Amino acid sequence: RNPTPNYNLALDGGYPVVIAEKGYGTVMANFAKRKAEGKGAEIISMTGGLATNQIPSASVATLITDKPAELVASLQKAGADYAKRNGGNFEISAKADGKDVKLTVTGVSAHSSEPESGVNPVARMLDFINSLDGKVALKHNHITDAARYAADNGRLDYLGNKLNVGFSDAFMGP
């Protein structure tokens, strides 16, 4: 007879037997849509990811402006500087489409059980947007509110240490 192994049940597993799977947590923060205030470009939408247990490969924000070429140049420069300061293992690009500017952060997709194997573009998009304050003229709205909240409450810390919810044990690790 073998000793009983350490295990847990993973109800979302597609396999007949799952020895263990790291869980994940979700912080749900809601920001009331509000009219943009101030001068500059306005972020009108932001996307990233299809499932809560997935680190997506890209996050896209759409901005509107009267000066798309100028905004693209500013975002490209700020994006290159931001990527260099934050590990350089992701890319930030901006492209004009009429008066719209598509801002894309490309990271590395991963399952949430192994966040260290991915590069979360949503976290980087929010942190990047927040870092633009004073460098690139952006109107403040619910999306910039969300970016500030994310920067203040976790930034790029995927282990939850800044929120005081970080956990680790010998069997599962962090």
Describe the role of every protein-language-model region:
Residues N2-P174:
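Midchain, well-structured core segments that form catalytic/ion-binding scaffolds
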